[in-house]
Amino acid sequence: LEGANLAPEELIELLAPLLSTPPIFIGILLLVALLIPMIEEAFKTLGVWLLKGRGISPAEGFVAGMFSGAGFALVEGLLNSATVASSTSTDWLGFVVGRLGGTLLHIFNGGLLGWAMANAWQGKKPAKVVGIYFLTVLLHGIWNGLAILELSPQFIASGNLTYIFLAVYALILLVAFVLFSRKVERQAAGSTN
């Protein structure tokens, strides 16, 4: 395999016997849907921490977190683009759905954590940061778990079912993002009156 430039479909076909083994698939799922989100969500909003002593409002924390999430999504998108560009894959639908949903996820999760941190810094329920962190890990883990389903032999046979799941989940995230953004906006307007 050294120097091989395999498309994701070719790699999946090559690894299918291993992936059909439940312990291996569960191990991959735990890594991708739990460990990676825990690490990414812990480090994604490091930029917001630089604002700790500045007395930012929860709305400002939300915006700073969204910027941190957008920066993270940009770097991740560039790395994923390089991977797709160097493969023989023609799966642009999967790439586009993955990047759109992934970008929304990173921006929303960054905003949630930034909002929670700013609330905590104002002395309002510091434990909320831990709860929001675990919520963002859950949201991220669901996204990654859905994305990894395409490696499951049962889902390989189902065609574009993974993309449908990802698109529906991205739509749910979009609705949650809009609703939460409106909540933050109302809170900010109420605190300035």
Where are these regions (language model features)?
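Hydrophobic alpha-helical segments at protein termini of multi-pass membrane proteins
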Residues: 1-193
